[in-house]
Amino acid sequence: MEPNQHVEAETELVTETLVEEVSIDGMCGVY
């Protein structure tokens, strides 16, 4: 695995986590 791919994978993971948190906040009406 090249370092560049590792960084992309980590970025994807962070993005997914942020999207999940935003979705949960949106459903709860918390902004």
From Swiss-Prot:
Traits of the deletion mutant: Cells lacking this gene lose the ability to utilize ethanol as the sole growth substrate.
Post-translational modification: The post-translational modifications that lead to mycofactocin involve oxidative decarboxylation of the C-terminal tyrosine residue catalyzed by MftC, introduction of a tyramine-valine cross-link, removal of the modified C-terminal dipeptide by MftE. The released dipeptide then undergoes oxidative deamination by MftD, glycosylation by MftF and methylation by an unknown enzyme.
Residues making up the signal peptide according to the UniProt record: none
Site (Cleavage): 29-30
Source domain of life: Bacteria
InterPro entries: MftA
NCBIfam families assigned to the protein according to its UniProt record, in alphabetical order: mycofactocin
Biological role: Precursor peptide that leads to mycofactocin (MFT) after extensive post-translational modifications by enzymes encoded by adjacent genes. Mycofactocin acts as a redox cofactor of nicotinamide-dependent oxidoreductases encoded in the same locus. Is required for the in vivo ethanol assimilation in M.smegmatis.
Extra information: Mycofactocin is classified as a ribosomally synthesized and post-translationally modified peptide (RiPP).
Family from the record: Belongs to the mycofactocin precursor peptide family.
Full protein name: Mycofactocin precursor peptide
Species whose genome carries this gene: Mycolicibacterium smegmatis (strain ATCC 700084 / mc(2)155) (Mycobacterium smegmatis)
Top-level taxonomy: Bacteria, Bacillati, Actinomycetota, Actinomycetes, Mycobacteriales
